[in-house]
Amino acid sequence: MNTDQQKVSEIFQSSKEKLQGDAKVVSDAFKKMASQDKDGKTTDADESEKHNYQEQYNKLKGAGHKKE
């Protein structure tokens, strides 16, 4: 593999790792929001609220994949 290809491969791998880290942060944030009410107290959110957060997460996740 020549040096240009190696550099591109290293940049791609670095970007991929960063995106995976960003996706985990977003996923964790949506999970946290789904489990809290407006006062920040843990609550048993009904399924429709949880579904809404999951739907938003899926849209964001899908938008990230479209850029590749």
From Swiss-Prot:
GO cellular component, one term: nucleus
Gene Ontology terms describing biological process: negative regulation of endopeptidase activity; protein catabolic process in the vacuole
Modified residues (N-acetylmethionine): 1
Keyword field: Acetylation, Aspartic protease inhibitor, Protease inhibitor
Stretches with biased composition (Polar residues): 1-14
Disulfide topology: none
Region called Inhibitory domain, residue ranges: 1-32
Highest taxon, organism lineage: Eukaryota
GO molecular function, one term: endopeptidase inhibitor activity
Keyword Acetylation in annotation: yes
Bias type Basic and acidic residues, positions: 33-53
Region (Disordered): 1-21, 33-68
UniProt key word Phosphoprotein: no
Biological function: Specific and potent inhibitor for yeast aspartic protease A (yscA). The proteinase acts as a folding template stabilizing the helical conformation in the inhibitor, which results in the potent and specific blockage of the proteolytic activity.
Family in the record: Belongs to the protease inhibitor I34 family.
Name the UniProt record assigns to this protein: Protease A inhibitor 3
Biological source species: Saccharomyces cerevisiae (strain ATCC 204508 / S288c) (Baker's yeast)
Gene from which the chain derives: PAI3
